[in-house]
Amino acid sequence: MPRTATTSAPPTLLTWGPRELPVPYVARWSGESVSTAGLVVKPDGSGLAYEDEVAADRDGHGVLWARMGEAVGVGRPDYRAMSSHRQRVAALCKLCQVCGGPADRTAKGWLFLMPAAPPGEEGCAEPEPIEGTLTTKPPICHPCAELAVRHCPHLAAPLYVRSRKPRVWGVFGGFVTPSPTGALVNSADTYMPYGDREAAPWFLASQLALELTRCT
């Protein structure tokens, strides 16, 4: 079972396993399962809905979200996946994705941490444009950024980005549409901007997408 770290890690950070590996606030646990039970096409054929849908199933833009249980600490942490609820809260409230506390902010903006671009054809890293980058990763605080770099293999060459205005751009998830037989078919995961009235009725969101603007 996870427990609160007592070293230099933030006080709210959970650890897991005999090596006491830090578990990010947004990380999904194996006890948190996604359920599509009750997902149907609306009677008028205009899009997706839940048979027992409640207001909390849609966000302020009317986009339907995948249902995921909240069970922090139950099972094993999946470092590759994020809890839909905690990711969304952290992205909206500018919370650190690792400890869940306030993310780091200076006059240059909020701190984001991401892997550097892969090497180019000649073996040299080709800089990617940062301005306008879409990300589902919430911001991070400075101590947790250092912690993440020490523990995450994909951050061997980290890129620290400051965004003065990380704008809520849309959502990440997938389209779910009926097949000729009436069965619902899932598409590959993709981004969808808010305001796409044609696509939104058939989209099932799992994460909030931020656009990093005014970056340094």
Regions inferred by a protein language model and the residue ranges of each:
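N-terminal alpha-helical interaction blocks
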Residues: 1-91, 163-216
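Long acidic/polar interaction regions in large eukaryotic complex-forming proteins
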Residues: 78-84, 91-95, 115-118, 123
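Short metal-coordination and nucleic-acid-contact micro-motifs, chiefly zinc-binding Cys/His arrays
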Residues: 89-95, 134-137
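Short cysteine-rich clusters marking metal-coordination/redox-active sites
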Residues: 96-100, 141
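Beta-hairpin (beta-strand-turn-beta-strand) motif
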Residues: 101-102, 116
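Short, non-ligating residues that shape and space the ligands of small metal-coordination modules
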Residues: 103-109, 150-151
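Conserved binding-pocket/active-site segment within a compact domain
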Residues: 112-204
